[in-house]
Amino acid sequence: MGSRFGRRKERNGDMLPLYESQSPQHLDSLENENDERISKLTGKVKSLKELTMNIGTEITSSTKLMESMNDSFDSTKSLLSGTMTRLKNVSKNGGISIWMWLAFFCLVALILVLVRF
């Protein structure tokens, strides 16, 4: 009969560790079961490691893409800012309001889009 500390009494009253009281075949089957579980666990750990590495690679590439997009937006912002400043100067000096220029550019953009498609 097993005790709560993993020991078992022999007929002569000695206490033996529970693993010594098991048959060798049973111990071999337990060892094989442990080996199978270890190999499954190793496979899962490898899969998680690969997934983590892929996530890291994706994060790195996404960060680079966002940085390049940020640089592009900054250059576009400065270009548009300069264009708007020049447009304001032209509209003030030429007597044509900025709204007329805006309507003109929208019309040109619309024509370009319609011609393209």
UniProtKB/Swiss-Prot annotation:
Q: Where is the composition biased (Basic residues)?
A: 1-10
According to its UniProt entry, the protein's GO biological process terms are:
endoplasmic reticulum to Golgi vesicle-mediated transport; intracellular protein transport
Q: Which CDD domains match?
A: SNARE_Bet1
Q: Specify the protein's topology with respect to the membrane.
A: Single-pass type IV membrane protein
Q: Name one GO cellular component term.
A: endoplasmic reticulum membrane
What InterPro entries does the record tag this protein with?
A: BET1_SNARE, T_SNARE_dom
Q: Which residues lie on this side of the membrane: Cytoplasmic?
A: 1-94
Q: Which family is annotated?
A: Belongs to the BET1 family.
Give the protein's recorded name.
Answer: Protein transport protein bet1
Q: Which gene encodes it?
A: bet1
